[in-house]
Design a protein with these regions (language model features):
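Extreme N-terminal basic, low-complexity initiation segments
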Residues: 2-7
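Active-site proximal loop and beta-alpha junction motif in alpha/beta enzyme cores
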Residues: 15, 29-104, 110-317
Length: 317
């Protein structure tokens, strides 16, 4: 174990511990909170989507939670608010640096459950349940790492391909006309866009003025926009452009939306599918998401899984 003291560094992050054996982490008392930096949906450390998880061992206001999320500036930061399970799960809140609190998000759910299981429950739990604003979300230990169950999908409005082409700098003919561009939510909404080629996926570039005009026309679409292309052999490539003009390297919530979309439009010609999504390659943070989805007479199963790695832990003042 190597411990790095950062006392002279002008930051509220210090005494960061890099440790490959994290089965136990002793909670510190007093005014400090334990924090963990987690790479989610990653095949190894320094890939996937970064997450800051804090264990709130003291009262912490909404204002302070928002300030911490802005300080670390990851796409999301989570706060574990209960020392033990309350109503069958752990109370958790999810914050973004710019949008504020969100009711649900995929990689924060997975990463927070990973921290609870390995650092506070001793690594023995088969399921960790999180009480989120959207409701209780179970996260299970599976052969794919950690797997969360998402809500049944809701389907909203359809968007014209030419509008998406203008906003994201791609040709209208690169969007697959066989399937709609559609708003979907399994807990946190996204607009799902089917593409014809990996080349088109790589060419996406968000046009801020065009996006702002687009949102004026479609305020319900102020959300993630998930682009995907079929790579064959039960594998999709995807990119997710967020509403604050940032690309997300791994988006569990939007991939749950995508799973519902694929079943609704019979994309794989099956109502019980398993496939893998590769996201984040174009930004150097390769992420791997394992999806299982099924639908039978209105009974939906949406499961999104992947591996998580704790890369740092320490105290937050």
């Amino acid at each position: 174990m190597v411990q790095t003291g950062l006392e002279d560094f002008p930051s509220i992050l210090y005494n960061v511990v890099y440790n490959d054996d994290r089965k136990e982490f002793n909670a510190q008392k007093g005014g400090f909170m334990n924090f963990f930096i987690v790479d989610c949906f990653a095949e190894e450390k320094y890939q996937g989507n970064e997450l800051l998880v804090l264990k709130a061992d003291r009262q912490i206001s909404d204002e302070e939670q928002q300030k911490i999320a802005r300080e670390i500036n990851f796409s999301e930061t989570t706060f574990i608010l209960s020392d033990k399970q309350e109503n069958g799960g752990y109370d958790v809140r999810i914050w973004t640096p710019n949008v504020g609190e969100v009711p649900f998000a995929g990689h924060p759910t997975l990463g927070t459950a990973h921290v609870i299981r390995n650092c506070y429950e001793g690594g023995g739990s088969e399921t960790v349940k999180l009480n989120l604003e959207v409701g209780q979300i179970p996260v299970a230990v599976t052969e794919d790492g950690m797997t969360m169950s998402q809500n049944p999908p809701e389907f909203g409005s359809v968007v014209q391909r030419k509008e998406i082409a203008v906003v994201f700098g791609i040709g209208e003919d690169s969007i697959d006309e066989k399937y709609p561009v559609q708003w979907v939510s399994t807990g946190l909404e996204a607009v799902v866009i089917p593409l014809k080629s990996r080349k088109a996926l790589a060419e996406i570039k968000m046009n801020r003025p065009a996006f702002e005009r687009y949102i004026e026309r479609h305020p319900e679409n102020y959300c993630n926009h998930l682009f995907f292309v079929d790579m064959g052999e039960n594998m999709l490539a995807a990119r997710c452009m967020m509403e604050d003009f940032i690309e997300d390297p791994a988006t569990g919530s939007a991939n749950g939306d995508l799973a519902g979309y694929l079943l609704e439009h019979d994309y794989f010609r099956s109502q019980d599918v398993q496939y893998t999504v590769i996201q984040g390659e174009d930004m150097g943070r390769k992420s791997v998401l394992h999806i299982h989805a099924s639908q039978n007479n209105g009974d939906w199963v949406i499961e999104v899984g992947g591996n998580c790695y704790i890369v740092a832990q320490g105290e937050w003042e």
